From Swiss-Prot:
Matches recorded under HAMAP family: IPP_trans
Listed cofactors: Mg(2+)
Organism ancestry: Bacteria, Bacillati, Cyanobacteriota, Cyanophyceae, Synechococcales
EC number, UniProt record: 2.5.1.75
Region spans: Interaction with substrate tRNA: 38-41
Gene (name only): miaA
Protein known as: tRNA dimethylallyltransferase
GO molecular function, one term: tRNA dimethylallyltransferase activity
Residues at which substrate binds: 15-20
Recorded catalytic activity of this chain's protein: adenosine(37) in tRNA + dimethylallyl diphosphate = N(6)-dimethylallyladenosine(37) in tRNA + diphosphate
Length: 299
């Protein structure tokens, strides 16, 4: 790969691994901005449940692709990729590339590997019909139509399930047969975080999310939008919604959120090890190791 290509740094890892903290430290040291690659942080008002960087943190370091749309306006992978590539192209001209931070594997791959998602626009009427069928039925439909996609998408992930079905019904072909790739105009250095005490960190963060007002945020979102909104069924929000509906108490919700998050982190680990090849940062103080790897990559 030509050394003349600019270096794009990606910081990846499972949820609660410490990406936000390290990203802020790296951004301040290197005087770079951050490009968000967390699919839920794209949405306005979903702050507590996604552990979105605080307003103070966003003032310290410029963040791109946060708060793009309302939660009832889904963003496809293709739309995310187009928005991200516009920012990257501008920063490339300025010779000040941001670095990618997030745990949404497919979104990362779209930027680091030049993944080309199918150009199928959202179809609100179809999504409404699929929503009426229920997520369990939708995932069964996907298993029949595109078994490969179904094996990669969690049974509870309504947004990605509907998107995969949308592509199948619009084109007559599985989404997994239509995702090509083309080399991006940059070199990529992937740094991975996967601390040994991740389970403990997940438990602590989940408790903190509820202390920070996850139930209150969910109640506000459910009043502003339909409580059947797919994003309100995702980890954390789904359990908080059940507290509001009287189906769970707070302690049960925390326990269930913790368990679902641990299961999600396991899937993230599997994805990153199969689809990416990061330098896994070791030790309790990854900043110095990350800086050394970045400086070596810039040479």
């Amino acid at each position: 790969m030509p050394a003349s290509k600019p270096l794009l740094i990606a910081l990846l890892g499972p949820t609660a691994s410490g990406k936000t903290c390290l990203a802020l430290q790296l951004a301040e040291q290197l005087k770079l901005s951050v490009l968000n690659v967390d699919s839920r942080q794209l949405y306005i008002g979903m702050d507590v449940g996604t552990a979105k960087p605080t307003k103070e943190q966003q003032r310290r370091v410029q963040h791109h692709l946060i708060d793009l749309r309302r939660p009832d306006q889904p963003i496809t992978l293709q739309e995310f990729q187009a928005a991200a590539q516009l920012i990257l192209a501008q920063k490339l001209r300025e010779q000040n590339m941001p670095f990618l931070v997030g745990g949404s594997g497919l979104y990362l791959k779209a930027l680091t590997c030049g993944l080309r998602p199918p150009a199928v626009p959202p179809q609100p009427e179809l999504r409404k019909q699929l929503g009426e069928l229920g997520q369990r039925t939708c995932h069964h439909l996907l298993q029949a139509a595109d078994p490969t996609a179904a094996s990669r998408i969690a049974p509870a992930d309504a947004m990605r399930t509907k998107r995969a079905l949308e592509v199948v019904y619009a084109t007559g072909k599985p989404i997994t047969t239509q995702q090509g790739s083309s080399p991006p105009p940059w070199r990529v250095l992937e740094l991975g975080l996967d601390p040994h005490n991740l389970r403990e960190r997940i438990g602590q963060r989940t408790t903190q999310l509820y202390a920070n007002g996850l139930i209150e945020e969910t109640e506000h979102l459910s009043q502003c939008y339909d409580s059947d909104l797919p994003l309100l069924q995702t980890i954390g929000y789904g359990e908080a919604l059940k507290v509001i509906q009287g189906l769970l108490n707070r302690e049960q919700a925390i326990a269930l959120t913790t368990r679902r998050t641990q299961q999600f982190a396991k899937r993230q680990r599997t994805w990153f090890r199969r689809q990416h090849h990061p330098y896994w940062l070791k030790g309790e103080e990854p900043l110095s190791e990350a800086l050394s790897l970045i400086q070596a990559g810039l040479r």
